[in-house]
Amino acid sequence: LMPIARQQLARESDASEIVFIDDALESVAEVNAHRAMNYLAFLNETASEKYVQIAIANSHVREKIAQRLKMDGIQLWSIIADNVVLMDQHELAEGSALSPFVTIGSNVRIGKCFQANLYSYVEHDCVIGDFVTFAPGVKCNGNIHIHDHAYIGAGAMIKQGTPDQPLVIGGGAIVGMGAVVTKSV
């Protein structure tokens, strides 16, 4: 996600430094031409504001890190690729990561730390919970409710629900890659 973060800072004319955080590091190193450090070193960095994009697929680990960041007064950072399409009346909570070629339809509500990988879309009137992960190429059609911590595998297609009976993907559900979901799970 670093290239997307760099694009976003450039688009916003923001000169903030991007650093990579990895608790396995014992000393400052370099990753993809950026300084890399453990979380304690990051906390000790001097900055007027600090934001973190949690680029970890495991939703429960993401949630734990988000809670720790909140306790430490560090804000979640949403990053959005240059070519993402955002339609009317959408709500995107903090900490989301929208990769290239993602589309978010109209009247969509998305919870915090949502990850939408390459070529995924969320169509109209969907509600996506917190810490949901879309692998590449997920097709989430209209009137679908996806609860917290669901994982939707690469190329999965979810059939459109109706306004009075949305299709529901339950909390913590795992939809396998290439799946075609026609009923609530």
Language model: regions and residue ranges:
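Structural signal for interior beta-strand "rungs" in well-ordered beta-sheet cores
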Residues: 79-185
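Conserved acidic residues
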Residues: 18, 50-51, 94, 112
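Phosphate-bearing ligand-interacting subdomains
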Residues: 25-85
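Glycine-rich adenosine-cofactor-binding loop
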Residues: 1-5
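NAD(P)-binding Rossmann-fold cofactor-contacting core
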Residues: 11-29
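Intrinsically disordered, low-complexity boundary segments flanking structured domains
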Residues: 6-7, 22-26, 65-66, 142-145
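Alpha-helix termini
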Residues: 7-13, 44
